[in-house]
């Protein structure tokens, strides 16, 4: 396994902590799976989390500068899989992305796979995104970013599709063709999904 952990470390980034559902199943992964989940937020977000979450949250920071991180002992990341560390950067309700990325690297996280398009955009604006990939699912679901966003499908009633064609035009344009499969519902209830 090239010295890497079996499970990647998950990082939830939130401006103020109010958008984190602490009853989500990601906070209920069996500790034997050794899945580590970290929350990154602002000082205001850390206050909200400590006041509103029933979970165990050791606080790492706060860090206003890279020098603050240099002088800190972050401790070992892959311990106590029942705890969800909160790494605090920035001031007020504004986390500091550059300080966060520096702290994550110091913690041993060399590569990050960012799922959220809005956070990828934020990293691009900061000049901090080296590469990106597009995850293209054949499940017609989603919210305002998907076709038919005004009346999106739920996780139990979405149509599926099969790839028919995947093509490329020069080096910067991909096109696809899909065959819709209707009536494929309730294949997997994602609300019960466990890691």
Predicted regions and their residues:
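Enzymes that bind and transform nitrogen-containing heteroaromatic metabolites
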Residues: 1-195
């Amino acid at each position: 396994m090239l010295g890497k952990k079996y499970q990647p470390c998950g990082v939830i980034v939130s401006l103020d902590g109010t958008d984190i559902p602490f009853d989500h199943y990601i906070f209920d992964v069996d500790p034997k799976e050794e899945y580590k989940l970290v929350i990154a937020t602002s000082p205001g977000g850390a206050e909200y989390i400590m006041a509103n979450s029933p979970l165990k949250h050791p606080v790492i920071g706060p860090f206003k500068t890279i020098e603050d991180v240099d002088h800190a002992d972050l401790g070992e990341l892959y311990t106590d899989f029942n705890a969800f560390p909160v790494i605090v950067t920035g001031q007020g309700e504004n986390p500091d992305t550059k300080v966060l990325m520096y702290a994550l690297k110091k913690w041993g996280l060399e590569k990050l796979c960012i799922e959220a398009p809005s956070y990828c955009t934020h990293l691009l604006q900061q000049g901090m995104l080296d590469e990106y990939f597009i995850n293209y699912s054949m499940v017609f679901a989603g919210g305002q970013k998907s076709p038919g966003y005004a009346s999106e499908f739920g996780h139990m009633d979405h149509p599926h599709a099969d790839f028919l064609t995947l093509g490329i035009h020069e080096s910067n344009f991909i096109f696809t063709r899909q065959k819709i499969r209707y009536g494929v519902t309730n294949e997997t209830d994602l609300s019960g999904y466990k890691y």
